UniProtKB/Swiss-Prot annotation:
It is an enzyme of class 3 (hydrolase). It comes from Pongo abelii. Dipeptidase that catalyzes the hydrolysis of dipeptides with a prolyl (Xaa-Pro) or hydroxyprolyl residue in the C-terminal position. The preferred dipeptide substrate is Gly-Pro, but other Xaa-Pro dipeptides, such as Ala-Pro, Met-Pro, Phe-Pro, Val-Pro and Leu-Pro, can be cleaved. Plays an important role in collagen metabolism because the high level of iminoacids in collagen. The modification Phosphoserine is found at S167. This is Xaa-Pro dipeptidase. Its EC number is 3.4.13.9. GO terms for biological process: collagen catabolic process; negative regulation of programmed cell death; proteolysis. Belongs to the peptidase M24B family. Eukaryotic-type prolidase subfamily. Mn(2+) 1 binds at D276, D287, E452. Mn(2+) 2 binds at D287, H370, E412, E452. The modification N-acetylalanine is found at A2.
Length: 493
């Protein structure tokens, strides 16, 4: 990022300075979209409510606060309990902060003035949250635009702004959500700089993990190392999601690492490791998966499966450009996986027939990737008019859109040997006819391989943000402690 002038978020040392002008530009983009919408009347005002601090169940133990994502996108405010309003006609923005009691200074530190927040976030105006009713009344809005809509990844409804006195205003809660979501789909240059930074630090952390892993370690030791590196070197207090540190058969558990399986297995000689981890900086995510042999050397079978996934990953990235339909990229990955599994002897028969039978969904039951930004599964995958395709494999896609410049996505093909899916396939004559059971048996307990990259769609191709060893030779050299430079994949830009 160019030298930052004006107010910025910065955690010192070598961390990234992020100008708060990033959020002013986001508010400007939102107003421009809304003004073009014929349903938006003159005098409309956007009202967003930030996140609130929460406690651990019935205790007084605070859960570490992280800002609500839409509010962060628009204002970049790190404090809880705030509101923000934006005059659509003028673009003028007002931040509302809590009026804190004097006792706050004893327990939590200095109570800052409204002028402090105005300067910190480069706002047009700052008022207290208990004044929002009177301030909005004085502005005489024709309508308040509040945020209500469904997140297509979680199925949850985002929280709509509410405050004492809102009932006396005319409120529209249908216009704002699709417009602000579409703004979030396309990243500005300043946003891309932050995502390059999150990828830089997280990539370095993955390389440190690959150098440190040893047979006999606990999976959580590597989780700890990753998070320590991201925080100590990158200022990343939060991870983008719960770390997945799967070894052996755990590497076939797609969302391993949860409370019931907390990265607690002892890594064994001969295991494949699948580590899916990403640090978060100033609410901007990264999402990177590396797969490698625990002992630093690929077996023939591990190499065959790994290089099958690497081939599909690079084929997809090489094909990405504006206008490409994302479901076609999933079909491309499936075909390559089936070709390679046939080459290893696990499958036999016509690859075209395998594709028709949707056999690829047996070895890759998840989608191919997702939008990435302020949320790891970022919004905008299925706007109105984009329908989910009800076919095995394709129904798991987190988006079915055509690619456009400025979109940031993950590319994460994988091949997994999941017992219950294999058993179902072998019990289905339409699938069983393709399997060589004797060869397949050799891969039972193998686990899985996933390669996950973060990329931005450019005017003519894509830019790879992630920088980790990917070829078999690069991985083995890294795990042996070699600091020899490697060349990241570069498709058309």
């Amino acid at each position: 990022m160019a030298a930052v002038t004006g107010p910025s978020f910065w955690l010192g040392n070598e961390t990234l300075k992020v100008p708060v002008a990033l959020f002013a530009l986001n508010r400007q983009r939102l107003c421009e979209r809304l003004r073009k919408n014929p349903a938006v009347q003159a005098g409309s005002i956007v009202v967003l409510q930030g996140g609130e601090e929460t406690l651990r169940y019935c205790t007084d133990t605070e859960v570490l606060f992280r800002q609500e994502s839409f509010f962060h996108w628009a204002f970049g405010v790190t404090e809880p309990g705030c509101y923000g309003v934006i005059d659509v006609d003028t673009g003028k923005s007002t931040l509302f902060v809590p009026r804190l009691p004097a006792s706050y200074a004893t327990w939590m530190g200095k109570i800052h003035s409204k002028e402090h927040f105005k300067e910190k976030y480069a706002m047009d105006d700052v008022q207290y949250t208990d004044e929002i009713d009177s301030v909005l009344t004085s502005q005489k809005p024709s309508v308040l635009l509040t945020l209500r809509g469904v997140n297509t990844d979680s199925g949850s409804v985002c929280r709509e702004a509410s405050f004492d006195g809102i009932s006396k205003f005319e409120v529209n809660n249908t216009i704002l959500h699709p417009e602000i979501v579409e703004c979030r789909v396309f990243k500005t240059d300043m946003e891309l700089e932050v995502l390059r930074y999150t990828n830089k630090i997280s990539s370095e952390a993955h390389r440190e993990v690959m150098k440190a892993v040893k047979v006999g370690m606990k999976e959580y030791e590597l989780e700890s190392l990753f998070e320590h590196y991201c925080y100590s070197r990158g200022g990343m207090r939060h991870s983008s999601y719960t770390c997945i540190c799967g070894s052996g058969e755990n590497s076939a558990v797609l969302h391993y690492g949860h409370a019931g399986a907390p990265n607690d297995r002892t890594i064994q000689n001969g295991d494949m490791c699948l580590f899916d981890m990403g640090g978060e900086y100033y609410c901007f995510a990264s999402d990177i998966t590396c797969s490698f042999p625990a002992n630093g050397k690929f077996t023939a079978d591990q190499k065959a499966v790994y290089e099958a996934v690497l081939r599909s990953s690079r084929a997809v990235m090489g094909a990405m450009k504006p206008g490409v339909w994302w479901p076609d990229m999933r079909r491309l990955a499936d075909r390559i996986h089936l070709e390679e599994l046939a080459h290893t002897g696990i499958l036999s028969g016509s690859v075209d027939a395998m594709v028709q039978a949707h056999l690829g969904a047996v070895s890759m039951p998840h989608g191919l990737g997702h939008f990435l930004g302020i949320d790891v599964h970022d919004v905008g995958g299925y706007p109105e008019g984009v329908e989910r395709i009800d076919e095995p494999g394709l129904r798991s896609l987190r988006t079915a859109r055509h690619l456009q410049p400025g979109m940031v996505l993950t590319v994460e093909p994988g091949i997994y040997f999941i017992d219950h899916l294999l058993d179902e396939a072998l019990a289905d004559p339409a699938h069983a006819c393709f399997f060589n059971r004797e060869v397949l048996q050799r891969f039972r307990g193998f686990g899985g391989v996933r390669i996950e990259e973060d990329v931005v769609v450019t005017d003519s191709g894509m830019e790879l943000l992630t920088c980790v060893p990917r070829t078999v030779e690069e991985i083995e050299a890294c795990m042996a402690g070699c600091d020899k430079a490697f060349t990241p994949f570069s498709g058309p830009k």
